[in-house]
């Protein structure tokens, strides 16, 4: 069983989602199915079919989250240090074409959220950054062509 690297915050978010699915969403969908059944003929009951579909999604997500959280390898990034990019690092890069500066935290795939500045260690830019230091340049192959970035900051915690 392969371990999944994760930050403490990432694990906490997944556990909170799992708890909500089990204690709020699952009971609500069971009630919705019961109410829809009371409306009679199930073959033409859109409410019933929608509730069953939602139940299927919820149960699938619960199974996925139980699997991921059971295999989580929590890495306390507050105890990490150094000048080399690795899991947990917060990294600033400068787009060598646009001169635009962007900051990312390198996290596990299940906690990545680009809008929040968290990118997966397995993403193209995440892979390119691993092992790099301030001043290093990286090339990231994108659908529109290669992009080049310079690492301008690496920090932990």
From Swiss-Prot:
Record carries keyword Coiled coil: yes
Keyword Disulfide bond: no
Coiled coil: 46-67
PROSITE patterns documented for this protein: GREAB_1, GREAB_2
UniProt-listed InterPro entries: GreA/GreB_C_sf (IPR036953), TF_GreA/GreB_CS (IPR018151), Tscrpt_elong_fac_GreA (IPR006359), Tscrpt_elong_fac_GreA/B (IPR028624), Tscrpt_elong_fac_GreA/B_C (IPR001437), Tscrpt_elong_fac_GreA/B_fam (IPR023459), Tscrpt_elong_fac_GreA/B_N (IPR022691), Tscrpt_elong_fac_GreA/B_N_sf (IPR036805)
Pfam families in the cross-refs: GreA_GreB, GreA_GreB_N
SUPFAM superfamilies per record: FKBP-like (SSF54534), GreA transcript cleavage protein, N-terminal domain (SSF46557)
Any GO BP annotation: DNA-templated transcription elongation
Keywords: Coiled coil, DNA-binding, Transcription, Transcription regulation
Family: Belongs to the GreA/GreB family.
General function of this protein: Necessary for efficient RNA polymerase transcription elongation past template-encoded arresting sites. The arresting sites in DNA have the property of trapping a certain fraction of elongating RNA polymerases that pass through, resulting in locked ternary complexes. Cleavage of the nascent transcript by cleavage factors such as GreA or GreB allows the resumption of elongation from the new 3'terminus. GreA releases sequences of 2 to 3 nucleotides.
PANTHER family to which the protein is assigned, alphabetical: TRANSCRIPTION ELONGATION FACTOR GREA
Name of the protein in question: Transcription elongation factor GreA
């Amino acid at each position: 069983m392969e371990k999944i690297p994760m930050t403490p915050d990432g694990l906490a978010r997944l556990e909170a989602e799992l708890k909500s699915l089990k204690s709020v969403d699952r009971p609500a969908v069971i009630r919705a199915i019961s109410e829809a059944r009371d409306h009679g003929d199930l073959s033409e009951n859109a409410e019933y079919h929608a509730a069953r579909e939602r139940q299927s999604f919820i149960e699938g997500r619960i199974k996925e989250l139980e699997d991921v959280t059971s295999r989580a390898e929590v890495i306390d990034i507050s105890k990490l240090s150094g000048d080399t990019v690795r899991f947990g690092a917060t990294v600033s890069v400068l787009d060598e074409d646009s001169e635009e500066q962007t900051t990312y935290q390198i996290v596990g795939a299940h906690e990545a959220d680009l809008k929040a500045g968290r990118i997966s260690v397995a993403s193209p830019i995440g892979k390119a950054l691993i092992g790099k230091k301030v001043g290093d340049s990286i090339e990231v192959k994108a659908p529109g062509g290669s992009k080049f970035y310079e690492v301008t900051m690496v920090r932990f915690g």
